[in-house]
Amino acid sequence: MISLCGIITAQEVEKDTVKKVSLDSLAATVNDHSMKLAGYEEKFSGLEAIVNELNKIKVSGYIQAQYEMYDTWSSDGTIHGVPVSGTTSYEDNSFYIRRARIKFTYKPIDGVNFVLQPNYEVHQVTLKDAYVQLNDRWLNTFSLWVGQFNRPTYEIEYSSASREFAERTLMTRTLYPTERDQGVKLEADFATKYNFPLKLQVAVLNGNFGEGSLASQAKDVDNAKDLMARGVYSVKMLSNSLGIDFGAHTYLGKTTVIAQTTPPTVFSDVNNNPFIPKVGDRLNKELFGGELQAYYDFLGGLSLKGEYIRGTYSGTTNAAQVNSLFNANKIRNVEGYYISFVKNIGKVNTASIRYDVFDPNTKMSGNAITNAGDLRYNNWTYAWQYFFNDNIKLMACYVMPINEKSQNAGEDFKIDKHDNIFTLRVQARF
């Protein structure tokens, strides 16, 4: 009996010892895991901070690769194609990277955006957008833009990635070269806070971007600033199936004569009369325009868009200021407009047609014109888009420029110069 009790007591002691050892081991294991978890938590906290910062950065962009056919002939029919830059040869077709852009948008805090968008070309990288946008967090109405950004007109602000045609109109490309400028812009959008569909934009700009060499565009060349303003009002009708935006804009600037030659360069005024400006003279560059866009949700959706611009424009051949599409020492009354019609065909196709006109000299016409740069152009553009998915689309576009005829502006322009262009484009965006 005593022996049996001793055995039982020994077993109980052994069990208690095992329990104690097991508990101590378990506690050590738990502590070890707790320390490891604390380390992981610290690492994850660091990763979370990095992820949170990365979430503030949005990266987007697009590539437009295309094949072009230049149905261009000289007046005597001996030359087919367009000049190849830097050579004496001509080409009538080419593969071409039209645009390759990547856009970085950083939002460090609510109401603040930093935007940087370079454009990559085969021979150079250029800066398209670089600005800081400060949004009003109190009234949710105002925003301030500082840097390099789009000039405020409809056709310019409508992205090249979304546009239904291969290129913007001749009017816009001439009057607002490269679309951007450097300066400061204030916007007021009364729709968000006050449910009033009015948007106002006012910008103070250097006024020389897109003119002269890239080095000349980095800063203002004449110290004077240009003013640009735009207003757009939106209405919806027919149970919101019809939307109409209409507005107006103005550009108030000057072309300053920053140098003269010996003998002095002779300019031409709006009446085609010669004059010799002095260094420091400021030549008018004042434009006034109207716009209208109508969207109707009918049979898949259709839209009708148009803009009209009229005013006085000036240019110079000075290398620091020259506008390649207005390359002359002159002041001119100019006028231009376009009308475009876009129709969705099913869910993945869009057909578009555009008629645009640009007259770089409204006071002269026909045989009175002695310089091809004063000829009026009426252009027809036809385009078809196929949307492969949300990121890839195909475009076929055909442009038919029709120039005003003059017997005194060069052999090529005694008749309509044959200079049509066909473009087949693939666009990928992300």
What positions do the PLM features span?
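Bacterial N-terminal signal peptides
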Residues: 1-6
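N-terminal periplasmic/intermembrane-space "pro-region" immediately following the signal or transit peptide
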Residues: 8-64, 73
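Outer-membrane beta-barrel pore domains
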Residues: 27, 88-89, 131-134, 148, ...
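Outer membrane beta-barrel
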Residues: 50-74, 84-210, 221-241, 250-252, ...
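Short, solvent-exposed loop/turn segments at secondary-structure boundaries
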Residues: 117, 214-219, 411-414
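A short secondary-structure junction signal
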Residues: 197-198, 211-217, 258-261
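Active-site-proximal beta-alpha loop/turn segments in soluble metabolic enzymes
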Residues: 203-218, 268-275
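Interfacial loop-to-helix transition and helix-capping segments at the boundaries
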Residues: 218-222, 285
